């Protein structure tokens, strides 16, 4: 299950988007809301969030500062910025971060925002699946390696192979003598 954090100092924007995302995703995505950058940072310090959709200009902490503060907490989070201003200097600064995943203008409309967040949620879900699969492969490899080590030792004890063959096999089995 993915988590989306909406951050904007305009409550009507946050509430409107939250309503649309909750209707769109049902219970498949947790939607968190914040009306300030500082409050959003507090949420991020206490919750695993996959995607942040944040305004740029907010009174207590701007979106760029929020992104920078979040980088140490969650290095794989996806940040998408939403603004009423076409600020190329800001876009340039924000895009330097590995967390940056896009910049949308509020005037582009809800459908553009919804589609972009759909893409980010799908990408986060794919990344989570890949991480689980990698973990499962590592567990299987560890189990298999133990089996191979036992089999090799049994073969060595029974006289199966020359000393040179044994020495050559040990590094591949993560073993030393």
Locate the predicted segments by residue.
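Active-site residues of response regulator receiver
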Residues: 8, 55
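Receiver (REC) domain active-site loop signature in two-component systems and cognate sites
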Residues: 58
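Interdomain helical linkers/hinges and coiled-coil/dimerization scaffolds
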Residues: 95-96, 102, 108-177
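Helix N-cap/capping motif at the beta->alpha junctions
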Residues: 18, 33-42, 63-65
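Two-component/phosphorelay signaling modules centered on CheY-like receiver
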Residues: 11-32
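Alpha4 helix (beta4-alpha4-beta5 surface) of REC/receiver domains from two-component response regulators
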Residues: 65, 86-103
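Short hydrophobic/Thr-rich beta-strand motif most characteristic of the beta2 strand and flanking loop
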Residues: 25-35, 43, 91
């Amino acid at each position: 299950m993915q988590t989306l954090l909406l951050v904007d100092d305009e409550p009507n924007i946050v509430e409107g988007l939250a309503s649309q995302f909750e209707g769109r995703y049902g219970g498949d995505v947790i939607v968190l809301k914040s009306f300030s950058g500082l409050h959003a940072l507090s949420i991020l310090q206490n919750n695993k969030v996959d995607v942040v959709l944040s305004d740029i200009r907010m009174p207590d902490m701007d979106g760029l500062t929020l992104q920078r503060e979040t980088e140490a907490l969650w290095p794989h989070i996806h940040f998408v910025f939403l603004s009423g201003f076409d600020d190329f200097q800001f876009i340039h600064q924000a895009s330097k971060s590995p967390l940056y995943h896009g910049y949308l203008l509020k005037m582009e409309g809800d459908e553009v925002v919804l589609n972009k967040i759909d893409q980010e949620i799908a990408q986060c879900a794919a990344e989570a699946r890949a991480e689980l699969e990698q973990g499962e492969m590592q567990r299987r490899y560890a189990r298999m390696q133990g089996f191979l080590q036992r089999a090799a030792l049994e073969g060595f004890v029974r006289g199966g192979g020359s000393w040179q063959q044994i020495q050559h096999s040990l590094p591949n089995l993560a073993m030393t003598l």
